[in-house]
């Protein structure tokens, strides 16, 4: 079974699909070895590793290179966060062909304007393109793919932008009708209430995907009760790495020797075993 088939079958199964965020090939391998179903090649995390904001600054090629390295390293599927699709429908077509040919199993595009800002940025820019414009991108993605199991995830930002539940549901329906394989409904609330409201109101037939960065106390069992099929832990690995490296360096700069902090590090053998 191909990685693409594997991801689709898991999404159609009874268990919630767990996706771990990564920012390079090594972190992707760690996601894989920890038992996750797939890897999320997140634009926020990849941008941060370049010391850049998540604001459409890196090019498609720069994001692609990271996701491609993950794909060549891992046996589990890679889901690439492709922001707004790097342009219009023609850009989306080119992107889909390139990502699919690299063995990446899925792309996720969102209905924001370009250049985007991270959805969780306080007082950030959260303007959306029209429903019609985003439908054109989905149609282009669907037409460009060769493998029907290469998944197109449409990310709905209407709740983030303050346009409300009805607009979110209307857009999600249009995106399903255009050919998307799943709907990622995004929220920056600290509780999952509006996500649950969306899921309970959703009349579509394609799966719902969530990213519980802000409502992080939500239980997997509760997500399943609301028929949510995929959870993406988008940035936790990056945040843990940032904290651990910062802590270690602050200790090391004042250390007489480093034997006292070796328990905080992986061994050389751990890295050889990658």
Question: Model-derived features: where do they sit?
Answer:
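Alpha/beta enzyme core
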Residues: 2-232, 240-247
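Extended, intrinsically disordered, low-complexity segments
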Residues: 143, 236-274
